[in-house]
Amino acid sequence: MSGRRKGCSAATASSSSSSPPSRLPLPGHARRPRRKRCLVPEVFCTRDLADLCVRRDYEGLRRYLRRFEGSCVSLGWPSQCIYVVGGEHSPHSLTEIDLEHCQNDFFGEFRALHLIGTVSHATCRYQVFVDAYGAVFAYDAQEDCLYELASDLAGFFAKGMIRCDPVHESICARLQPNVPLVHPDHRAELCRRSRASARGRYLRSLLAFRELLACEDTAARCAYVEAHREAQLTLIWPEKHSLVLRTARDLGLSASMLRRFQRSLYTREPVMPLGEIEGAEDKTFFHRVRILCGDTGTVYAALVGQDKLVRLSRDLRGFVRVGLALLIDDFRYESIGPVDRSSLYEANPELRLPFKKRRLVVGYFDSLSSLYLRGQPKFSSIWRGLRDAWTHKRPKPRERASGVHLQRYVRATAGRWLPLCWPPLHGIMLGDTQYFGVVRDHKTYRRFSCLRQAGRLYFIGLVSVYECVPDANTAPEIWVSGHGHAFAYLPGEDKVYVLGLSFGEFFENGLFAVYSFFERDYVDEIVEGAWFKHTFAGMYELSQILHDRANLLRVCQLHAGSKIRLGGSPACTFTFGSWNVAEADEANNFVIGVLEQAHFVVIGWMEPVNKAVFMDAHGGIHVLLYGTMLVKLAETLRGFIRQGSFWFRCPRRFCFSPLDSSATVAAKPVSSHTSPAYDVSEYVFSGRSVLDSVSGTGAS
């Protein structure tokens, strides 16, 4: 037995030494195939690209771009916008002459730029550069200008081309195909004049700042400001604006306020004031804006009434180049050419800026089926969120005011279009004043008594037609007070209308309180029924004789005894003639007789409120409430038939004129504004004003 065991063990040992033992599969388990080791394929990573740019490893950046040349990355905005990786050897690369042009002719000094690829949108291509600080730029060869897209690559991939004006223009041209575009020759001339103007304004500003730029540190800058107090240094933009050098004592900035400014910064560096901005006129958006400079040379702006600083540029020379353009989100760099000492005296004072810098607005319009249900606006999630932010109450004493929630919501949903109950196909595009570029002074709104008593005001958007971007100069502005009241300011009329005392009233009525909508020109019966919902068939004949009082009275006499349904809500019936007035009592007969001596003529009766309706000597429509109490309902008989008894639903004053106006300005209809043609033109715009000699507005 022992020998046999020894033989078996020896055989086993010899077999184990010659070949490895095979692992037998366990019962119930299949044998797994052996996997081969393989290398994971490398893919393009935005973090690796950003890391190379931050470390300024330009040799590694060049190799990385060459390795992943042709890779595509979708940008954050707009949709279908692609970033294509590529370097100096890519087929769409710039020439050396173009690269030197971008490095020398845009910033007033040489700035090293490294090409990292191109951005493709529609049929356009934009070369993308990164500088030594990590900022990303895009070059528009058609207009010969640079756009600063973001301060780093992470912001570039998140924001995309939202700072590039040609992309906004192409999107607006696609949304509004009927709007005529600027002729290419005229546009080229505007760009040439803009480049010449930018160079002249930059040379003047550089000449004014040359001594301050020579200061090497903060102590030297403080000494220069102290020695040159009240000196005015011209800015490149805005025009006719300058930086007035002032110390902290002159500006009223205490040490605690400077520390508060310092805590609002990301790096929390010490800051020193340089001065404040003054313009040619006091009514300017940039008046009293304070300019501060940090120890690292970064220039900040302190807006009026705010405790946070806004970063303008990384150094003082950059501030001389851009001015206050970043406050309106203008990141465009014009080609100003090379600048040296001999060119500082080339500034031509006759050069003017040909067109105003402004931010383009892009709206987001949902389909009509998702906005309306049986002709009425849906109470969508955007409306619901606006209501919650509008009616927010403070549950705790230390929580911020409700207006902060409303402002945050409006900024988060900027560009969304919400339909109004009336007029048809009209709505409000949400956004704050910075989004639309509204730069009016608050004194403009404080001229109205209703806004003086409203407390704090919050801007929530502009009124526009469906699929049309509003114009900030003419579109009605919607404001909300701290008490929850809704107001509409019409710049063309310079009037304020009270739309509602709550969110529910604003949502139910829309712009029905804006009387100028009811003085539009007559189009046809279908439009009259869709807009105003009255049953008067002779509206066309009535529109031809609005300012002829004798013919108006003749029309009322011809329709004596006929009943019509007035527009608006609540539903009321109007009877032409004066037959029902004869049945009034003796007191009312006496009042009516006195009014007739004052050239007030009875033209009919309103039911079911049972009130007599009068026409004054100028064609205005009044209603007799009780005793000698008269309320003016409309400027013309046409406006009265269209708007109807809306005042009886909300018996209060709707329209307010400025307190400093010496004479009452005629209320022009909204249709008199010059606007491009749209697909819904039969509902909206016409080109002729119908009120030439009328004073006041409805229910004023």
Curated annotation (Swiss-Prot):
Contributes to activation of immediate-early gene expression. Pfam families: US22 (PF02393). It comes from Human cytomegalovirus (strain Merlin) (HHV-5). Belongs to the herpesviridae US22 family. This is Protein UL29/28. It is found in: Virion; Host nucleus; Host cytoplasm. Interacts with UL38 and host HDAC1; these interactions are necessary for the HDAC1 interaction with UL38. Interacts with host MTA2. Keywords: Early protein, Host cytoplasm, Host nucleus, Virion. InterPro entries: US22-like. Signal peptide: none annotated. One of its GO terms (cellular component) is virion component. Residues 9-21 have a biased composition (Low complexity). Residues 1-30 are annotated as: Disordered. The keyword Membrane does not apply. The keyword Manganese does not apply.
